[in-house]
Amino acid sequence: MGDDYQSIYRFSGCNLNVFLNFKDYYDKAKILYLNNTYRNSKEIINIAGKFIMKNNNQIKKELNSFTSINKPLKFVYYKSIKKDLTKLIMEVKSKGSVLILSRNNFDINKYLDFNVFQIDREGNIYLNNEFIKVRFLTVHKAKGLEADNVILINLINSLYGFPNKLEDERIFKYVNNYKDNIRYEEERRLFYVALTRTKNNIYFYLDKSNISIFVKEIKRENKKYIECIKK
């Protein structure tokens, strides 16, 4: 069982060709599709589905949801990177469990005010030594998980932003013969995973002067699903 949309471990040698050409490897196999999702709203499915299909090498799927949310994309433009995130966490945690997701392990150090919060090795976040149902994880670690609401941080256009612009190590051309036909295919799948961790809303925590190309694309193509919030 697997999902080519969530194939995000090429750095460890995983090959998307196994999904794309499954019957070439197992000619007697029967492929069954799971078409219903019980986590995401119809709107998130539509947004994420349109986003991932910009990749050339993905299997087109029709997914169904039984819930609807009017504007699940919350664009939060901050003035103070740490203070405004503190405010946002306190607001969102009152609505249920929260995942704070980012592209890189070290991103949280720039964003979280450690004078207010504490964080353990598992990414659990504490306020006054009390767990507040908020976790910080990289998107890779969050695969398979869910929360009532998700906050995405470090959505900037830079080498270590999202998408991450580091080039693959040369060794991968020897261990993995699959080639991306457009730039950032794996990063796009990773962003898809981030978008689909939420049961309700996604909060994009944004620096108005430096915004990820993925976020710009989401904004351009999904304006009716977006609520803008200025801190």
Segments (PLM) and residue ranges:
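Conserved nucleotide-binding/hydrolysis micro-motifs of P-loop NTPases
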Residues: 4-8, 13-16, 37-41, 105-107, ...
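Conserved helicase/translocase motor-coupling segment
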Residues: 80-149, 154-156
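Conserved helicase C-terminal RecA-like lobe
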Residues: 94, 142-208, 216-217
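Conserved RecA-like helicase ATPase core segment
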Residues: 1-71, 167, 215, 226
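Short glycine-/polar-rich loops that comprise or flank the Walker A/P-loop
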Residues: 3-5, 26-31, 70-72, 132-134, ...
